[in-house]
Swiss-Prot record:
PANTHER family: UPF0179 PROTEIN MJ1627 (PTHR40699:SF1). This is UPF0179 protein TV1250. Coiled coil: none annotated. It comes from Thermoplasma volcanium (strain ATCC 51530 / DSM 4299 / JCM 9571 / NBRC 15438 / GSS1). It holds the Pfam family UPF0179. It comes from the Archaea. Belongs to the UPF0179 family.
Length: 145
């Protein structure tokens, strides 16, 4: 069953993918905030249907948000290689806290937009990832727990 959420009317297109960054303090008094915030922070979603319903919003440009149906997607992270890294394992993700800001993988190693101690199931282990700091890193496909 799809989840219902709200997204800026300029972004409300079927097939668009996004990561829910979490609630904003500005939204605490909004009458429809529960619809916006019924998604999990840091999880990846795809819009599957755009409904015609528009709601006011002080955050998005145009001051309007569309009601949309979304599905949660699998995601990937880049994690340090270890003997415990196995398909099917449930692991607690920890940020690398890397300071190499020009690295193209920094968001997936540092777990931006994620809650601390995120639990995931490793669906598949992908290729090696070149780390400019010399760590042995792997790309892994995950599902959220």
């Amino acid at each position: 069953m799809p989840k219902i959420s709200l997204i800026g009317k300029d972004l409300a297109k079927e097939g668009i993918e996004f990561v829910f960054a979490g609630p904003l303090p500005t939204c605490s008094d909004c009458r429809v905030k529960n619809v916006c915030f019924n998604l999990e922070q840091g999880h990846k979603y795809r819009v599957t249907k755009v409904r015609e319903q528009l709601n006011p919003c002080i955050i998005f440009n145009g001051d309007k948000v569309n009601t949309v149906e979304v599905e949660e997607l699998e995601d990937f992270f880049i994690i340090q290689e270890s003997k415990k890294l196995q398909e099917g394992a449930i692991v607690t993700m920890k940020s690398m806290n890397c300071d190499y800001i020009t690295c193209p993988n920094i968001e997936k190693c540092n777990l931006y937009y994620q809650k601390n101690d995120l639990k995931v199931a490793i669906k598949s282990i992908g290729q090696n990832v070149n780390c400019p700091k010399g760590f042995k890193m792997k790309k892994v496909q995950v599902t959220y727990k």
